[in-house]
Amino acid sequence: MDDFISISLLSLAMLVGCYVAGIIPLAVNFSEDRLKLVTVLGAGLLCGTALAVIVPEGVHALYEDILEDPEAARSSNSKITTTLGLVVHAAADGVALGAAASTSQTSVQLIVFVAIMLHKAPAAFGLVSFLMHAGLERNRIRKHLLVFALAAPVMSMVTYLGLSKSSKEALSEVNATGVAMLFSAGTFLYVATVHVLPEVGGIGHSHKLDATGGRGLSRLEVAALVLGCLIPLILSVGHQH
């Protein structure tokens, strides 16, 4: 019962924190140039959180002494949407938290929760800013944000409640928490580099130049991208395993 209350509170905190972070870009009126700058910053946050927060946490959960090189998985289908990619990522986060809760170790639960929250907020911010840049209606953006915010809490509860004792032991043996977090890091990098950056840089998935000539990113936008990558690194300084 204590574990159930714990996972319920953590899931609720994830839902509220993620939705509030995503609402921020909607609450401010941006000009077209400023919106593009914010979108680039969001892409930087996605890359930074994947490389500085999620990957280290996932690797640490898998290995303590020896690091092995995992095989890189390639997808032949590039038609996946940004929202779907991040929802899949959020679902993986939920599995990670649900698996951590099943261990009945409070310290493990808190470490995974902190790691997830460090990148859930930037992910929500990046998703909403990209959808705004793409010209989606605000009501539809809120629906996309709600689906994204619900994915991790729902999956964490489903994972926790749906596992039998033997299944929990099996997940512990294969380090399900670490695997799920590394999978979510991959979806972050995919969305940021395949969807967001090509879109704001003026080059779509067809790799043809748009009306702006496909000029790429300006110096200010590159600076925003770098800043977005550095913010998660700075926030994670001092976070000990």
Curated annotation (Swiss-Prot):
GO terms assigned for molecular function: androgen binding; G protein-coupled receptor activity; zinc efflux transmembrane transporter activity; zinc ion transmembrane transporter activity
Compartmental location: Golgi apparatus, trans-Golgi network membrane; Cell membrane; Cytoplasm, Perinuclear region; Mitochondrion
Its primary localisation, in coarse terms, equals Golgi
Statement: the UniProt record of this protein carries the keyword Transit peptide: no
So where does this one cross the membrane?
4-24, 35-55, 80-100, 110-130, 144-164, 178-198, 220-240
Pfam hit, one: Zip
Domain of life (superkingdom)? Eukaryota
Annotated glycan sites: N29, N175
Decide whether keyword Cytoplasm is in the record: yes
UniProt keyword terms in alphabetical order:
Cell membrane, Cytoplasm, Glycoprotein, Golgi apparatus, Ion transport, Membrane, Mitochondrion, Nucleus, Transmembrane, Transmembrane helix, Transport, Zinc, Zinc transport
Q: Could you give a single Gene Ontology term from the biological process aspect? A: bicellular tight junction assembly
Q: Name one GO cellular component term.
A: trans-Golgi network
Q: Which reaction does it catalyse?
A: Zn(2+)(in) = Zn(2+)(out)
Q: How does the UniProt record describe the way this protein sits in the membrane?
A: Multi-pass membrane protein
**Function of the protein:** Transports zinc ions across cell and organelle membranes into the cytoplasm and regulates intracellular zinc homeostasis. Participates in the zinc ions efflux out of the secretory compartments. Regulates intracellular zinc level, resulting in the enhancement of AKT1 and MAPK3/MAPK1 (Erk1/2) phosphorylation in response to the BCR activation. Also functions as a membrane androgen receptor that mediates, through a G protein, the non-classical androgen signaling pathway, characterized by the activation of MAPK3/MAPK1 (Erk1/2) and transcription factors CREB1 or ATF1.
Family membership noted in the UniProt record: Belongs to the ZIP transporter (TC 2.A.5) family.
Q: Can you name this protein? A: Zinc transporter ZIP9
Q: In which organism is this protein found? A: Pongo abelii
The upper taxonomy is: Eukaryota, Metazoa, Chordata, Craniata, Vertebrata
